[in-house]
Curated annotation (Swiss-Prot):
Pfam families the UniProt entry points to: PDZ
Keywords on record: Cytoplasm
Record localization: Cytoplasm
One BP annotation, GO: synaptic vesicle transport
Domain PDZ: 47-129
Protein's UniProt name: PDZ domain-containing protein 11
Any one annotated GO CC term: presynapse
GO molecular function: protein-macromolecule adaptor activity
Organism: Gallus gallus
Disulfide bridge partners, by residue number: none
Amino acid sequence: MEGRLPYDDFPVVFLPPYESPPAWVPPHERVYHPDYNNELTQFLPRTVVLKKPPGAQLGFNIRGGKASQLGIFISKVIPDSDAHRAGLQEGDQVLSVNDVDFQDIEHSKAVEILKTAREITMRVRYFPYSKCLLAPNLVT
């Protein structure tokens, strides 16, 4: 088997746990039923602005980057931090920071941009299933 990776060298990808579908609800009752939410605004891109005093932490961790081919994602948000109060959440994909595209950026470059900026304008979108696909996190 020349040219092929040994089985143990393949990356491990964990899928989210299976969720049983909710009980069937007639279509005319779905509008008001709590198990049927057609509100998609939580998945639309949004802007988050953070100001970081010198020496302070941002209040969140990131994962991913160009090597993972998945983009940069928020892997953890510290409760009661400025990032938490600004609306960042675990599973947010970072689309850009201060007009720098983060969708195809090296992890180290993303960390450098986030750590050196004093005022950060982030464009993010919520993508919850990214949490199960990402490499170990890095505190920023």
